[in-house]
From Swiss-Prot:
Belongs to the lambda phage gpD family. It comes from Enterobacteria phage P21. It is found in: Virion. Coiled coil: none annotated. This is Head decoration protein. Stabilizes the head shell following the rearrangement of the gp7 subunits of the head shell lattice that accompanies expansion of the head.
Length: 115
């Protein structure tokens, strides 16, 4: 019997930037287009559903999407706590540095640059 060893090469992807516990929850999805994992989320005032954070108001992001969505899902899973790598988060293109820095103010989420 011949055994062949295969060495897997993986890219090191670090999404966490601290040792805070990262807890998840599920919520109603208001997302209607394909959305990558690690996208900041906010509550839609009209529907009460979780949608992609628009980057307009600091402190209004309440979660980070755990898994990518196709846009047809009625529910989603999101991180409700933890410290994430700033570089790993899929930020809105229009967000400025001040709003990004304080996106999760008042929540159990935070972010920091990786060393």
């Amino acid at each position: 019997m011949v055994t062949k060893t295969i060495t897997e090469q993986r890219a090191e992807v670090r999404i966490f930037a601290g040792n805070d516990p990262a807890h998840t929850a599920t919520g109603s999805s208001g997302i209607s287009s394909p959305t990558p994992a690690l996208t900041p989320l906010m509550l839609d005032e009209a529907t009460g559903k979780l949608v992609v954070w628009d980057g307009q108001k600091a402190g209004s992001a309440v979660g980070i999407l755990v898994l990518p969505l196709e846009g047809t899902e009625t529910a989603l899973t999101y991180y409700k706590s933890g410290t994430f790598a700033t570089e790993a988060i899929h930020w809105p293109e229009s967000v400025d540095e001040h709003k990004k820095a304080n996106a999760f103010a008042g929540s159990a989420l935070s972010h920091a640059a990786l060393p």
